[in-house]
């Protein structure tokens, strides 16, 4: 499932201090992976093994390198970098993009997005958000409780008392997470996170005795 840059901006612009520098239509570009990288040696001309399908981040080091070049060499490096089909380029610390980058990106339909965050801080924040977006997930029929900080999922055929078991735990001071339909997401490291759906919320369905 792809995520457009427009949706990213709508959801995280305030939190991550994001601003679109290119024309609005470039924000329809789609991010299809949670991988975020810096272009590295591509700026110096080595394009072999460049993973252009990933979101790219330009920090102070990359921009300082481009500024160290002659205007012509800097322009060539930018054009070479943007000749690939890149989903989005982030520029950290609110730094100014190199001369000609925004114009070239507009021509190529590549969004350039500025963030006020420092590079390391931004990497962590955007990576966490994208991992959550692209994490594999499924819906399971069952009841989920939080028991001393650990999720306990009760599964089985209808009518065997899953909800009743969780209710018994709730009466003992534990917490109901979801009943009937549990949305389970697998994060990095094999961690499973369960939550309820927006319709049922923290309500429970229980048969009358």
Can you describe what each PLM-predicted range is?
Residues 129-149:
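P-loop NTPase nucleotide-binding/switch module
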Residues 56, 144-146, 153-155, 175-177, ...:
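Structured core elements
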Residues 149-177:
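Glycine-rich phosphate-binding P-loop
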Residues 85-88, 94-129:
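Charged, amphipathic alpha-helical linker segments immediately N-terminal to NTP-binding catalytic cores
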